[in-house]
A protein has these predicted regions:
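CBM-like carbohydrate-recognition segments
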Residues: 48-98, 110-117, 130-145, 151-170, ...
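Post-signal peptide N-terminal segment of mature Sec-exported envelope proteins
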Residues: 34-49
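Extended ligand-binding clefts on enzyme/binding-domain cores
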Residues: 206-209, 214-323, 330-341, 353-382, ...
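Bacterial lipoprotein signal-peptidase II cleavage site
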Residues: 27-34
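C-terminal motif of bacterial Sec signal peptides marking the signal peptidase cleavage site
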Residues: 23-25
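Extended ligand-binding groove/face enriched in aromatic
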Residues: 117-121, 127-258, 263-265, 376
């Protein structure tokens, strides 16, 4: 194996955020109706009381282990997922399940659980460390590579990254030449998967920044070849600059949302879409060498996005499915809230967010996530696969929601 690039997680230059500072998954559905499931909701009746730092850390271990065990136990019987997405959810190398593994592997860096580690390793071996190749350029289908390469980092097994490297070499030799505007919808091979538009040959939608860039970065790290992250870094910033709103400090899901308004006349910034991007930045920074020339640029983007998100938490501790229009969907939405809580907690733990307000918001967010977990470990209030702020029921649950809470737990377990 090539010389490993050093992975450094360091305390980063502190720029405090004032209390008043400003601070959307991959899918097919879009619903413009307002959820009416708001009359004295149960989630408002059982809010957790304030916890000590020790209790927060303990709760992170308890919650993460419970939800990880529950989720793994459901594989092969995902009856609770709508039939329209059940078969895809059962595919370990499709983005839905891959998003769970991103959270799980981050948790396994905190909690050294040999049974869960063996599960991840055996799943990966059973797939021969393969990517889905029906959509060779599609970011969603590169997400599982993060888990394969993580196994190389943990075990030294070079076989785990070889198929990803082979495919990424092909992409570098056949770079897509399309713009980032979401235009024509095209069918893919068997019809089991889809493109929303030809621009998805690149990373033209918010979700993509969570799914793919870190895979390319990790590949550079384990091979010692910078060409993979050079490509990913360039593509990340092309998309980030295109979708980020300087006015709001938030990300549009894709170009179709630039001028879109909700029923209440507000701009449409999808909670989970922003969660995908916001969570991607700490994940990238954790793996990015300290001296990399793009490092400060990622940190500055993180600060801008965090400043906006800190202002948008609901009184119950969640982030709205429609960030600028909390009346669009008034119930909790845990996947976006989990990703955002993770990102903010990471900023506090790494000395970027230094004010008490940020810490209080993170603790409130964690308590809200904790309240959304069933006694059996099921993660409730998770918006199903989509691309817009859609209604959510308590019984709605999906693998990426579990992954988001695991990410949050990985930071709350270090809380000070």
């Amino acid at each position: 194996m090539g010389t490993m690039m050093l992975k450094k997680l360091t305390k980063i230059a502190v720029i405090p955020l004032a209390v008043g500072a400003v601070l959307t998954g991959c899918g097919q559905s879009s619903d413009t109706t307002t959820s009416n499931e708001v009359a004295k909701p149960a989630y408002q009746e059982q809010q957790s009381q304030s916890m000590t730092v020790s209790e927060i850390r303990d709760s992170a271990f308890n919650i993460a282990n419970k939800i990880a065990d529950w989720q793994v136990a459901q594989f092969g019987n995902l009856h609770y997922i709508p039939e329209s997405h059940r078969a895809k959810s059962e595919k370990p190398n499709f983005w839905i399940q891959a998003s769970f593994y991103i959270g799980l592997t981050k948790w396994l860096e905190v909690e050294k659980d040999p049974e869960l580690f063996n599960y991840v390793e055996n799943m990966s071996k059973d797939l021969d460390y393969g990517l889905l190749l029906e959509r060779p350029y599609h970011a969603d289908d590169h997400a599982i590579g993060q888990t394969y390469i993580w196994l190389t980092e943990q075990t030294g097994n070079e076989d785990a990254y070889k198929p990803t490297q082979e495919h990424f070499d092909w992409i570098l030799a056949n770079k897509p030449n399309v713009g980032l505007e979401m235009l024509d919808r095209t069918a893919s091979g068997s019809g089991n998967f889809h493109h929303e538009g030809n621009c998805q040959l690149r990373w033209c939608w918010a979700d993509a920044l969570y799914m793919a860039p870190r895979t390319w970065l990790k590949l550079s790290n384990v091979t010692g070849d910078p060409k993979y992250f050079e490509y990913a870094d360039s593509e990340f910033w092309a998309t980030a600059d295109y979708l980020f709103s300087d006015e709001y400090g938030l990300f549009f899901r894709d170009s179709r949302y630039f001028e879109m308004k909700s029923d209440n006349g507000e701009p449409v910034f999808w909670g989970r879409g922003n969660g995908w991007v916001f969570a991607s930045i700490p994940l990238i920074l954790d793996d990015l060498p300290e001296g990399h020339p793009s490092r400060e640029r990622y940190i500055e983007l993180y600060k801008k996005n965090a400043a906006a998100l800190l202002k948008l938490q609901t009184p119950e501790g969640y982030w709205p499915a429609s960030l600028m229009d909390p009346n669009k969907v008034k119930t909790p939405e845990v996947s976006g809230s989990g990703f955002i809580t993770y990102g903010l907690a990471w900023g506090v733990n790494n000395g970027i967010l230094t004010d008490n307000n940020s810490k209080e918001i993170v603790e409130k967010g964690w308590k809200a996530l904790k309240d959304a977990i069933g006694e059996d470990g099921r993660v409730n209030w998770v918006q199903h696969v989509g691309k817009s702020p859609d209604p959510v029921k308590k019984t709605d649950s999906q693998l990426y929601g579990t992954g988001a809470v695991l990410l949050a737990a990985s930071e709350m377990a270090k809380w000070q």
